[in-house]
Design a protein with these regions (language model features):
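Thr-Gly-centered strand-to-loop micro-motif
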Residues: 41, 67, 146-147, 168
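Alpha/beta-hydrolase fold catalytic core
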Residues: 131-136, 141-149, 153-161
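Conserved AMP-binding/adenylation subdomain of ANL enzymes
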Residues: 20-37, 44-131, 140, 161-165
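Conserved A3 ("GATE") glycine/threonine-rich loop of ANL adenylate-forming enzymes
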Residues: 93, 147-155, 167-172
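Gly/Ser/Thr-rich helix-start
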Residues: 5-8, 12, 50, 149, ...
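A conserved hydrophobic position in a structured secondary element of the catalytic/binding core
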Residues: 14, 90, 151
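Conserved AMP-binding A3 loop
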Residues: 1-23
């Protein structure tokens, strides 16, 4: 079903070739190999969740982990540290909450802001912030794919600044 942006929700038929072309694209562009881990957080009723988290992961021989509880930042962080997923796909709110809770307070402190103004120290602080963010998300991933809603501009600017590997996904 579509979300009904131009009216009421309505069913949409997706042909096999459309779904398979997306799976084939994933094989070309995303680094999942047999035995890699995927944490499924997106709804299976959402095309991206079904294609990437399930069909592509299954076809690639990855191990797919489904969260059985409502995903909170704490549950997600624990899951990522145990599972160590290769590529992560999620909605912006998950990344925003984790970054705002665990990383930004350290960098936005008085001393953090002061150190970010010192050229050589600036690079070290950004590197440490990037490494801390990578560890929160399992420390084993190549990229986080974020989509399904607008992304917080402050968090996005911060992730760009520290060189964090992410992609904003958009689909129709």
């Amino acid at each position: 079903y579509t979300s009904g942006t131009t009216g009421y929700s309505k069913g949409v038929m997706l042909p096999y070739r459309s779904i398979w072309s997306n799976v084939a694209y994933c094989f070309e562009m995303l680094p999942v190999k047999p035995g890699d881990h995927i944490v499924s957080m997106l709804p299976m009723g959402h095309v991206f969740g079904m294609v990437y988290d399930f069909l592509y992961g299954f076809s690639a021989g990855a191990h797919i982990y489904f969260l059985t509880r409502m995903p909170s930042p704490k549950i997600i962080s624990q899951s990522f540290s145990e599972i160590k997923p290769r590529v992560i796909s999620c909605v912006p709110l998950i990344v925003e909450k984790i970054i705002k809770k665990d990383i930004l307070p350290k960098v936005d402190s008085k001393i953090g802001k002061l150190l970010l103004k010192v050229p050589i120290v600036n690079d070290k602080i950004k590197s440490l912030a990037r490494q801390a963010a990578m560890e929160i998300f399992g420390g084993n991933f190549d990229e986080i794919i974020i989509g399904g809603a607008p992304f917080n501009a402050e968090v996005e600017a911060f992730l760009k600044k520290i060189g964090f590997p992410y992609t904003i996904a958009y689909g129709m």
